[in-house]
Amino acid sequence: MKIGVLALQGAVREHLRHIELSGHEGVSVKRVEQLEEIDGLILPGGESTTLRRLMNLYGFKEALVNSDLPMFGTCAGLIVLAQDIVGEEGYLQKLDITVERNSFGRQVDSFEAELDIKGIANDIEAVFIRAPHIEKVNSDNVEILSTVDDKIVAVKEGNYLGVSFHPELTDDYRVTQYFIDHIVAEHKHAAV
């Protein structure tokens, strides 16, 4: 399958590497037209306000709001997918959750953890950098996949996967592989 990484900011190369390690083709997505050429899209981390500005500038918001393309958001990508952000309205509103930005602290408070992620594995390496967490799940359709210190850090809803951390900054590509082999593949199979 062909999986795109929104290449406006963030760890694009690292996500592409994880896609390739998963046995699939990775594509840097820089133009809206490319969305029609891919089976799924990864929204990388970075700074969510900047990411939203760039998505507006290049026309991605409208295209993605109106799309059922499977999407995987990491860190800032999770924030972009959320229905609500504490204190403001969400952006793409694909995951029926409320997120809180920087809830684990500032840059100096960054940390790594080994997570038990439902349906994937109990030893997933995760890097948290100014990470958000999922404050609230707003629907029974959202499946909680993992928590850290009683904070929700990974969820799935339909075609969408969101995590608070940066799986791409480790050598462990199983979260990306799960997105492709389960969420994207199921969507593609259902569309046939």
Swiss-Prot record:
Pfam families, per the entry: SNO
Pathway of action: Cofactor biosynthesis; pyridoxal 5'-phosphate biosynthesis
Catalyzed reactions: aldehydo-D-ribose 5-phosphate + D-glyceraldehyde 3-phosphate + L-glutamine = pyridoxal 5'-phosphate + L-glutamate + phosphate + 3 H2O + H(+); L-glutamine + H2O = L-glutamate + NH4(+)
Top-level taxon of origin: Bacteria
Active-site residues per Swiss-Prot or TrEMBL entry: 75 (nucleophile), 166 (charge relay system), 168 (charge relay system)
Record carries keyword Cytoplasm: no
Gene Ontology terms, MF aspect: glutaminase activity; pyridoxal 5'-phosphate synthase (glutamine hydrolysing) activity
List of residues binding L-glutamine: 46-48, 101, 129-130
Keywords on record: Glutamine amidotransferase, Hydrolase, Lyase, Pyridoxal phosphate
Any GO CC annotation of this UniProt entry: cytosol
GO terms under biological process: glutamine catabolic process; pyridoxal phosphate biosynthetic process; pyridoxine metabolic process
Annotated EC: 4.3.3.6, 3.5.1.2
Keyword Cell membrane among UniProt keywords: no
UniProt cross-references to NCBIfam families, sorted A to Z: PLP_synth_Pdx2 (TIGR03800)
Role noted for this protein: Catalyzes the hydrolysis of glutamine to glutamate and ammonia as part of the biosynthesis of pyridoxal 5'-phosphate. The resulting ammonia molecule is channeled to the active site of PdxS.
Family under the similarity heading: Belongs to the glutaminase PdxT/SNO family.
Complexes and interactors: In the presence of PdxS, forms a dodecamer of heterodimers. Only shows activity in the heterodimer.
UniProt name for this protein: Pyridoxal 5'-phosphate synthase subunit PdxT
Native source organism of the sequence: Staphylococcus carnosus (strain TM300)
Gene: pdxT
